[in-house]
Design a protein with these regions (language model features):
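Residue-level recognition of membrane-helix boundary sites in multi-pass small-molecule transporters
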Residues: 71-72, 103, 130, 160
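Membrane-embedded alpha-helical hairpins and interfacial helices in multi-pass inner-membrane proteins
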Residues: 50, 122-204
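Hydrophobic transmembrane alpha-helices
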Residues: 2-74
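Short helix-perturbing small/polar motifs within transmembrane alpha-helices
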Residues: 3-19, 39, 96, 102-151
Length: 206
């Protein structure tokens, strides 16, 4: 590429182009991921025997973590939690504020997104065989926070906490983990990147 062509390519067309591209991109990804998880939270089924609803959030958390990397995913889930506490009605069932016994799962989402992002940055999302353990690890972290918080908030023993905060959800979350473990490697394949490649192919670098 000639110097003149490179200059034209870098020249800003609108005011937004004056901002660093990475900052604009990352901000949009963080806000978009938080909104996506808030949308999935509205896929909500309440059960009579537990204060914790069945939602689609877990799938969004796993996808955000592996697709965005740990920094952006962590920021997205912190935004989701803080905005929800501040009044944005995007917790399950359009709830906002402190959601009591189920809030541990929200904290678990942050930790799980960071963990999945950390693993993805080391290639865990490039094949199904490597994605499955990463997704399972994310699920374990969510349950560790969620069930512990549930037990402390409602003064439950371990068996009660597991029966209300783990057993009703494990089958559905296993399906979500399997979906996420399949989608990420498929996305890499569709982009044309090699399985173990971590930089763009020649000619595609910015």
């Amino acid at each position: 590429m000639s110097d003149a062509a490179a200059l034209r390519q870098r020249s800003p067309l609108v005011l937004a182009d004056l901002l660093p591209g990475a900052l604009v991109r990352d901000t949009l990804l963080v806000v978009g991921a938080a909104g996506f998880i808030g949308l999935l939270a509205q896929i909500s089924i309440h059960l009579s025997f537990t204060p914790v609803p069945i939602t689609g959030q877990t799938l969004g958390v796993l996808l955000a973590g592996t697709a965005l990397g740990w920094r952006r995913a962590g920021a997205a889930l912190v935004l989701y939690a803080v905005a929800g506490l501040a009044g944005v009605p995007w917790f399950a069932g359009q709830a906002s504020g402190y959601v009591g016994a189920s809030f541990g799962y929200v904290l678990g989402f942050i930790a799980a997104a960071i963990l999945c992002g950390f693993l993805a940055e080391r290639g865990a999302d490039r094949s199904v065989l490597r994605s499955v353990p990463a997704m399972v690890a994310g699920e374990v972290v969510i349950y560790a926070f969620g069930v512990t918080w549930l037990a402390l908030d409602l003064h439950l023993n371990a068996a009660q906490a597991l029966s209300e905060g783990f057993t009703p959800f494990v089958a559905g979350d296993a399906i979500k983990a399997a979906i996420a473990a399949g989608l990420l490697p498929a996305a890499w394949w569709l982009t044309g990147y090699r399985r173990n490649q971590t930089t763009p192919p020649a000619g595609e670098a910015g």
